[in-house]
Amino acid sequence: MSLALSISGRRGAFQLQVDATLQPEGVTVLFGASGAGKSSLLRMVAGLDPCEGTIRFADQLWRSSGLSSERKNDVDLAVWQRPIGMMFQQPTLFHHLTVQGNLNYVARRRRSPIGQVEQVIKQTGIAPLLSRRVDGLSGGESQRVALARALLGTPRLLLLDEPLSALGEEHKQGLLDLIALAAQTVPVLYVTHNMDELLRLADQVWLMEQGRVVAQGPVGQELSRLDGVLAQRADATALLAGEVGSYVREDHLQGIRVGSHTLWLPGLQRLTPGEPVRLRIAARDVSLCLSAPNDSSILNILPAQVVGLRDVGPGQCLVQLRLAGQCILARISGRSARQLSLFPGTDLYAQIKAVALV
């Protein structure tokens, strides 16, 4: 169920032009600074804002416009004809209804079976809220209800426009978990400029600048590209895919297996062995040495190989490393890079000072 876009649109002086294809599963994050065109693109996909060009989802044509002034063969499906569920920064709920009333209204319009309504209520954990009016809900509760409503009617695509931007940190994690769960059964196009949300959710990423998708690909690949937009950021971060290993009770350390290596994290004893996880490693938290140190307090020191190097500022060098078949970044001084005589193919050791689950 891929989404193929070849569209353009204008709002005032702002021009958007996008040619891209959404993968048929998982979460694709539209990432970029405010004003890059992320929300505008999402609204065009939904049919809320006009655009020219072609939008095709799976075998269904949602939008097609030609150059002819007569436009006899144009296709432009209305919002309600597109099999989508939507969430926005502010939940668009009916404030004169209870939570149950909001769900019932959408279920009737989308002809959702009773069993599906019950399933969505259970999935989003909103059963205790059903009798409450939505104007008495907290921000986190309102967004959980909005997500439940978006899931009704079995949408084939979820469009989420910065759904967590108005929430405090205490409410975000639960909703991130719910969105990740929903993405197991329906593809998601997710707008954000928040790096934590990108790291937590993205399978694929579209990087937007000035109304264009300037790069797209698997999130791990785009994060670790030396010439990529994300690697140039001060908070440049890489992702490693691993799985939960053993827990050392006397040291309160949790092992995470990455290939044939193990990284150690404090605590986390409640994780399930074998469970797939993601690790985030900031480039500034990786230092390099040519031989294995024997007297370091750093727990995670792993063999790696230099893939490439790039100057990223006065006296700063970004090093791309291959570690257990995946790539991470190290930000070191240019002087250190020269003293170590680093070049592609150099075998060395990466000292990872901090690593965290996402």
Curated annotation (Swiss-Prot):
GO cellular component: plasma membrane
Superkingdom assignment: Bacteria
Keyword RNA-binding found: no
GO molecular function term, any single one: ABC-type molybdate transporter activity
Keyword Nucleotide-binding set for record: yes
InterPro entries reported for this sequence: AAA+_ATPase, ABC_transporter-like_ATP-bd, ABC_transporter-like_CS, Mo/tungstate-bd_C_term_dom, ModC_ABC_ATP-bd, Molybdenum_import_ModC, Mop_domain, P-loop_NTPase
UniProt main location, coarse: membrane
Gene3D superfamilies given in the database record: 2.40.50.100, P-loop containing nucleotide triphosphate hydrolases
Stretch forming the signal peptide: none
Entry-linked SMART domains: AAA
Subunit structure: The complex is composed of two ATP-binding proteins (ModC), two transmembrane proteins (ModB) and a solute-binding protein (ModA).
General function of this protein: Part of the ABC transporter complex ModABC involved in molybdenum import. Responsible for energy coupling to the transport system.
Reaction(s) catalysed by this chain's protein: molybdate(out) + ATP + H2O = molybdate(in) + ADP + phosphate + H(+)
The enzyme's E.C. designation: 7.3.2.5
PROSITE patterns: ABC_TRANSPORTER_1, ABC_TRANSPORTER_2, MODC, MOP
Membrane topology: Peripheral membrane protein
Family of this protein: Belongs to the ABC transporter superfamily. Molybdate importer (TC 3.A.1.8) family.
Every ABC transporter domain range: 2-235
Enzyme class label: translocase
Record gene name: modC
Keywords: ATP-binding, Cell inner membrane, Cell membrane, Membrane, Molybdenum, Nucleotide-binding, Translocase, Transport
Amino-acid positions noted as binding ATP in the UniProt annotation, renumbered to this chain: 32-39
Domain Mop per the UniProt entry, residue ranges: 295-358
Compartment(s): Cell inner membrane
Stated name of the protein: Molybdenum import ATP-binding protein ModC
